[in-house]
């Protein structure tokens, strides 16, 4: 009986279909507003809610808090060491997924502070304070051991005896931010290490520009704008000493003079003093460190500083260039001006943060760039998996003078470079959403400017 009913239904449907189709009006330019058809976006489109952004930050926090334990153990007995007066060469950090003293974690500490301020949730701030306090409590006993034995080992050895800007710059900036945010721990010895290394030990060109001796002698790394300059500017804010601001502006302008392409509006990754020509590979994350430097220096640079307008002009030129290379998915490419290179998450997050911050501080045109920020954040959010890991991040990268080097850099969820930028971006997007209104106007995202 059921089979007969199904057959009858099928026959009736077959006869009814032409009549139904004939009764429907055809979809064409006359009968339908085609411009209102829903596009098939590869990335969520539109301004997210504060709640949606907060959920992404929550996943990242929950993951990182679980996989970055803040304690010191004996590497042989695996027992926790609580009395730091009894430290010896066997003391190491309890193993986690990420290093507590890397430059990437300096960015993460700053990102946690920003997320705490934006969301009002103390747990983010506590994350940074707990770990920075641990580093600070290790500093004095470690220095005492090093004085007695220069070959002594310590989990914070490279922080107190840096070999490169990577070892101290981003961490130093985070230490100052934490202190300015109310941290009670004595970070003085850590800041002294930063002052000494950046101020007198890091290699420089003849005009004082921060440089490295690799991969070629006297090489400028765009990364070093961030590894050295924001820390110096933060020390200026902390101490009130103008010399730190003067040096920060000097570094920005001297890096930019050599490495910024004004026609493209973006920076090359490396510049070698001894080369007759300077190959331009516009690596995305290095450009991220540069634009982040510009924003972070402006945040603390006195309004009356004579170099402020030049830094502001450089920021606007760079943001304009970066915006022109954003992919339709919301991401930016590994090599900015080579759209056949892969889409990269950490750089996209840094741009989302830097542009949102620049809008919130009034440095750039809010209506012109806010939609790009929304698209960028929506793209980044798709790369935070259910566990809270950030996908699509390029691993640590040196410097190359051929395209294959950049095209084929691996990506990995354990590339630590993605986490701080995602926290910073989410925090600043929340701040933007709290102060600005967005609408869909004729299908496109627009910031509402009318009163």
What are these regions, as identified by a protein language model?
Residues 1-9:
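Bacterial N-terminal signal peptides that target proteins for export
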Residues 21-23:
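Boundary at the C-terminal end of the N-terminal hydrophobic targeting segment
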Residues 189, 219-334, 341-352, 364-402, ...:
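Extended ligand-binding clefts on enzyme/binding-domain cores
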Residues 9-19:
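Bacterial N-terminal signal peptides
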Residues 125-129, 136-271, 278-280, 387:
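Extended ligand-binding groove/face enriched in aromatic
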Residues 25-103, 118, 122-125, 130, ...:
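CBM-like carbohydrate-recognition segments
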């Amino acid at each position: 009986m059921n089979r007969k009913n199904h057959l009858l239904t099928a026959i009736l449907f077959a006869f009814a279909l032409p009549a139904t189709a004939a009764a429907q009006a055809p979809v064409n330019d006359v009968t339908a507003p085609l411009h209102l058809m829903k596009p098939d976006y590869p990335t969520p489109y539109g301004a997210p809610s504060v709640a949606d952004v907060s959920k992404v930050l929550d996943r990242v926090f929950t993951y990182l808090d679980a996989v970055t334990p803040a304690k010191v153990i004996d590497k042989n007995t695996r027992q926790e060491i609580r009395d730091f007066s009894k430290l010896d060469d066997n003391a190491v950090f309890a193993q986690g997924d990420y290093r507590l003293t890397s430059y990437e974690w300096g960015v993460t500490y700053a990102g946690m502070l920003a997320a705490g301020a934006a969301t009002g949730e103390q747990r983010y701030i506590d994350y940074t304070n707990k770990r920075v306090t641990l580093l600070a409590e290790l500093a004095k006993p470690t220095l005492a051991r090093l004085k007695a034995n220069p070959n002594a080992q310590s989990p914070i050895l490279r922080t107190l005896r840096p070999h490169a800007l990577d070892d101290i710059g981003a961490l130093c900036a985070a230490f100052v931010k934490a202190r300015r945010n109310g941290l009670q721990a004595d970070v003085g010895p850590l800041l002294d290490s930063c002052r000494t290394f950046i101020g007198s030990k890091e290699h420089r060109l003849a005009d004082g520009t921060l440089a490295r001796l690799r991969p070629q002698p006297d090489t400028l790394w765009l990364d070093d704008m961030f590894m050295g300059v924001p820390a110096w500017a933060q020390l200026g804010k902390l101490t009130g000493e103008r010399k730190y601001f003067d040096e920060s502006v000097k570094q920005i302008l001297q890096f930019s003079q050599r490495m910024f392409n004004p026609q493209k509006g973006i920076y090359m990754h490396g510049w070698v003093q001894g080369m007759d020509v300077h190959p331009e590979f516009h690596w995305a994350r290095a450009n991220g460190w540069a634009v982040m430097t510009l924003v972070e220096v402006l945040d603390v640079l006195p309004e009356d500083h004579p170099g402020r307008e030049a830094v502001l002009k450089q920021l606007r030129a760079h943001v304009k260039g970066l915006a022109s290379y954003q992919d339709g998915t919301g991401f930016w490419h590994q090599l900015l001006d080579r759209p056949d290179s892969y889409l990269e998450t950490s750089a996209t997050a840094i741009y989302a943060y830097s542009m949102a911050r620049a809008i919130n501080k009034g440095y750039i045109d809010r209506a012109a760039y806010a939609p790009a920020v929304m698209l960028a954040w929506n793209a980044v959010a798709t790369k935070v998996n259910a566990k809270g890991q950030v996908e699509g991040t390029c691993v640590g990268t040196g410097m190359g003078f051929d395209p294959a080097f950049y095209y084929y850099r691996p990506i990995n969820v354990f590339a630590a470079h993605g986490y701080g930028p995602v926290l910073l971006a989410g925090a600043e997007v929340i701040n933007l959403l709290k102060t600005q209104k967005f609408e869909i106007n004729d299908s496109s995202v627009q910031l509402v400017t009318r009163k």
